Each structure stands twice: as structure tokens, then as C-alpha cells.
């Protein structure tokens, strides 16, 4: 086929998976002909795999406060947050700290 793919892994934990069809781990093959950053990834996720209550995951163009984002086990705040450019085989983990009581 010859189309370039950017393969990454998404993981959801501590309740975040409930917003994504209760699937804790997804392997994605994104269009490798464009540059992907976290901002683009969040838009793609909203359009393609976010199945429940997007307001619990997204706030504007970013994740809600209370959603931790780790890229290859590193806090995304150290990597540039929305501007981080995804690399092949990156692992992006979303952890919800929002729990009812």
C-alpha cells in the first residue's frame, strides 16, 4: 500500500476507559503523512473513539483538569503538553483522577 503510518498506543486507566467504550488499550495507526501532536490527537480521539460524555474528558481543546497525561511514562507537562509531537511507538496514557463520592 505504501502509505506511511504513525503507530502509537493509547491507554486509559482509573475510569478514563469508561469514556472510550471500556477499552483500556488501543493500538493506533495514524496517517503518517501529517505531523501529529497531542492537540491533533485529542481532536482525532473526540471524533473517532470518545463514546461517552466528552465533557468528562475534554475542556475546550485540551483535557479536563483531573485527567493526567503520561507520554512514555513522562508527565506531558514536561514535554510541551498539546505541542508535543508524537513519535513512532509512543505510549500515551490517560489517567482519571475524577472520582465520585
Swiss-Prot record:
<dbReference type="Pfam" id="PF09138">
    <property type="entry name" value="Urm1"/>
</dbReference>
<dbReference type="GO" id="GO:0005829">
    <property type="term" value="C:cytosol"/>
</dbReference>
<dbReference type="GO" id="GO:0032447">
    <property type="term" value="P:protein urmylation"/>
</dbReference>
<keyword id="KW-0819">tRNA processing</keyword>
<comment type="function">
    <text>Acts as a sulfur carrier required for 2-thiolation of mcm(5)S(2)U at tRNA wobble positions of cytosolic tRNA(Lys), tRNA(Glu) and tRNA(Gln). Serves as sulfur donor in tRNA 2-thiolation reaction by being thiocarboxylated (-COSH) at its C-terminus by MOCS3. The sulfur is then transferred to tRNA to form 2-thiolation of mcm(5)S(2)U. Also acts as a ubiquitin-like protein (UBL) that is covalently conjugated via an isopeptide bond to lysine residues of target proteins such as Prx2/Jafrac1, Ciao1, Eip71CD and GILT1.</text>
</comment>
<dbReference type="InterPro" id="IPR012675">
    <property type="entry name" value="Beta-grasp_dom_sf"/>
</dbReference>
<dbReference type="GO" id="GO:0034227">
    <property type="term" value="P:tRNA thio-modification"/>
</dbReference>
<feature type="cross-link" description="Glycyl lysine isopeptide (Gly-Lys) (interchain with K-? in acceptor proteins)">
    <location>
        <position position="101"/>
    </location>
</feature>
<comment type="pathway">
    <text>tRNA modification; 5-methoxycarbonylmethyl-2-thiouridine-tRNA biosynthesis.</text>
</comment>
<keyword id="KW-1017">Isopeptide bond</keyword>
<keyword id="KW-0833">Ubl conjugation pathway</keyword>
<dbReference type="GO" id="GO:0046329">
    <property type="term" value="P:negative regulation of JNK cascade"/>
</dbReference>
<dbReference type="InterPro" id="IPR016155">
    <property type="entry name" value="Mopterin_synth/thiamin_S_b"/>
</dbReference>
<keyword id="KW-0963">Cytoplasm</keyword>
<dbReference type="InterPro" id="IPR015221">
    <property type="entry name" value="Urm1"/>
</dbReference>
<comment type="subunit">
    <text>Interacts with cer.</text>
</comment>
<comment type="similarity">
    <text>Belongs to the URM1 family.</text>
</comment>
<feature type="modified residue" description="1-thioglycine">
    <location>
        <position position="101"/>
    </location>
</feature>
<protein>
    <recommendedName>
        <fullName>Ubiquitin-related modifier 1 homolog</fullName>
    </recommendedName>
</protein>
<dbReference type="GO" id="GO:0002098">
    <property type="term" value="P:tRNA wobble uridine modification"/>
</dbReference>
